[in-house]
From Swiss-Prot:
Disorder: Lymphoma, Hodgkin, classic: A malignant disease characterized by progressive enlargement of the lymph nodes, spleen and general lymphoid tissue, and the presence of large, usually multinucleate, cells (Reed-Sternberg cells). Reed-Sternberg cells compose only 1-2% of the total tumor cell mass. The remainder is composed of a variety of reactive, mixed inflammatory cells consisting of lymphocytes, plasma cells, neutrophils, eosinophils and histiocytes.
Organism superkingdom: Eukaryota
Name recorded for this polypeptide: Kelch domain-containing protein 8B
Biological role: Involved in pinching off the separated nuclei at the cleavage furrow and in cytokinesis. Required for mitotic integrity and maintenance of chromosomal stability. Protects cells against mitotic errors, centrosomal amplification, micronucleus formation and aneuploidy. Plays a key role of midbody function involving abscission of the daughter cells during cytokinesis and appropriate chromosomal and nuclear segregation into the daughter cells.
InterPro entries: Kelch-typ_b-propeller, Kelch_1, Kelch_domain_containing_8
Positions annotated as Kelch repeat: 1-31, 32-79, 81-127, 128-175, 176-222, 224-281, 282-329, 331-354
A Pfam family per the record: Kelch_1
Length: 354
């Protein structure tokens, strides 16, 4: 797109969700945005399921989830949405896997995960669902990799990740699944690893240069970006506290190395717990938490062509801890926390896509 900066983007505001929530699970299927589970005002996981018809801009209530949960993963398989893992009302990870049949408007239980887990990362490839890592009921990070075969309704084990973690960022590129970051307890993970789907082997890549919690990650044009977050103090710096940063680190998949961009190419705002995505040749960073007493509403983009950060139109509703989903020219920002769990549903769009 030839327009620069904010001229290339606009916000599209959708009707608010009937149910306010944070840590909801989201999916997009055939013109419908599904929002499943999450935590409501009481702080407990929900079984509520709702869908937004993108054409009519109307919300419909769906049959409730058989298992109330928050922080689950979701994968679209044709006319089905598979919901995997998460945490239940007693804050315990669950093994439940359930599928919503779009054409029939009902849920079906599927083969459970071999181990209960929250913070599972999922990737779909050729109709198979890969579930990586997670945190079990004992709070230990998991290294397990499982693949779900829908025709047989079963999970099979694959070679474990070299580094156990939960809440990692995953990217499918070629025949490889890239796994970046995540956490082990309260500690952020710097590992960057790739699973070859054909050879079924793991490769360790150089670790992230800096240790940051609640960073944002994206992949675009053969590079992986790690942005912002809470910088963790070094092992010998006992008096330092975590602090918000605007760090930008970039991994070149072809050359196999990280570059920490100079101060002049850092984000404009220091932020953590924000939404990040790739739209029209830009890496975009949306909302989150910073040094201010309330969530950020600022939005910025890094132009891959011009190699600079530019301010974009601010969020209509400033929030952090949002669910997000990219569908075509739209990056949806759903729910999250404003002054409490939010009902807001907004999408940052390329102007040609509004």
């Amino acid at each position: 797109m030839s327009a620069g900066g904010g001229r290339a983007f606009a916000w599209q505001v959708f009707p608010p969700m009937p149910t306010c929530r944070v840590y909801g699970t989201v999916a997009h299927q055939d013109g419908h945005l599904l929002v499943l589970g999450g935590c409501g005002r009481a702080g407990l996981p929900l079984d509520t399921a709702e869908t937004l018809d993108m054409a009519s801009h109307t919300w419909l209530a769906l049959a409730p989830l058989p298992t109330a949960r928050a922080g689950a993963a979701a994968v679209v398989l044709g006319k089905q949405v598979l919901v995997v893992g998460g945490v239940d009302e007693v804050q315990s990870p669950v093994a439940a896997v359930e599928a919503f049949l779009m054409d029939e408007g009902r849920w079906e239980r599927r083969a459970t995960l071999p181990q209960a887990a929250m913070g599972v990362a999922t990737v779909e490839r050729d109709g198979m669902v890969y579930a990586l890592g997670g945190m079990g009921p004992d709070t230990a990070p998991q290294a397990q990799v499982r693949v779900y075969e829908p025709r047989r309704d079963c999970w099979l084990s694959l070679p474990s990740m070299p580094t156990p973690c939960y809440g990692a960022s995953t990217f499918l590129h070629g025949n490889k699944i890239y796994v970046l970051g995540g956490r082990q307890g309260k500690l952020p993970v710097t590992a960057f690893e790739a699973f070859d789907l054909e050879a079924r082997t793991w490769t360790r890549h150089p670790s992230l240069p800096s240790r940051r919690a609640f960073a944002g990650c994206a992949m675009a044009e053969g590079s992986v970006f790690s942005l912002g977050g809470l910088q963790q103090p070094g092992p010998h710096n006992f008096y330092s506290r975590p602090h918000f940063v605007n760090t930008v680190e970039m991994f070149d998949l072809e050359h196999g190395s990280w570059t920490k961009l100079p101060r002049s190419l850092r984000m404009r705002d220091k932020r953590a717990d924000f939404v990040v995505g790739s739209l029209g040749g830009h890496i975009v960073a949306i909302g989150g938490l910073g040094n201010q007493p309330c969530p950020l509403g600022s939005v910025e983009s890094f132009s891959l062509a011009r190699r600079r950060w530019e301010a974009l139109p601010a969020m209509p509703t400033a929030r952090c801890s949002c669910s997000s989903l990219q569908a075509g020219p739209r990056l949806f920002v759903i729910g999250g926390v404003a002054q409490g769990p939010s009902q807001a549903v907004e999408a940052l769009c390329l102007r040609d896509g509004v």
